Amino acid sequence: MMYCLPVVCILLLLIPSSATFVVESRLEKDQAQSFTGDAWKRVSPIHEMIQRSQCCAVKKNCCHVG
């Protein structure tokens, strides 16, 4: 079994929101929307990981995939 550190969980939760903020602040809105859409398709495995880390933060048994 693998266990995440709480810090890793927190970082995983913070990355998407900060990345989106940077994209929106640097690009115009329509460009930001299309970019975020394309990027989101590429990072969907990361999104799964984030959901797992949220679960890990709640259940305290990090990254164990049954």
Curated annotation (Swiss-Prot):
Post-translational modification (record): Contains 2 disulfide bonds that can be either 'C1-C3, C2-C4' or 'C1-C4, C2-C3', since these disulfide connectivities have been observed for conotoxins with cysteine framework V (for examples, see AC P0DQQ7 and AC P81755).
InterPro entries: T-conotoxin (IPR031565)
Propeptide: 21-51
Tissue specificity of this protein: Expressed by the venom duct.
Domain of life: Eukaryota
Signal peptide stretch: 1-20
Primary location recorded for the protein, binned into one broad class: secreted
Modified residues (Valine amide): V65
GO cellular component: extracellular region
Gene Ontology terms, MF aspect: ion channel regulator activity; toxin activity
Record keywords, A-Z: Amidation, Disulfide bond, Ion channel impairing toxin, Neurotoxin, Secreted, Signal, Toxin
Subcellular location: Secreted
Signal keyword on record: yes
A Pfam family of this chain: Chi-conotoxin
Domain notes: The cysteine framework is V (CC-CC).
Function description: Probable neurotoxin with unknown target. Possibly targets ion channels.
Family affiliation: Belongs to the conotoxin T superfamily.
Protein name: Conotoxin Cal5.2
Species this chain originates from: Californiconus californicus
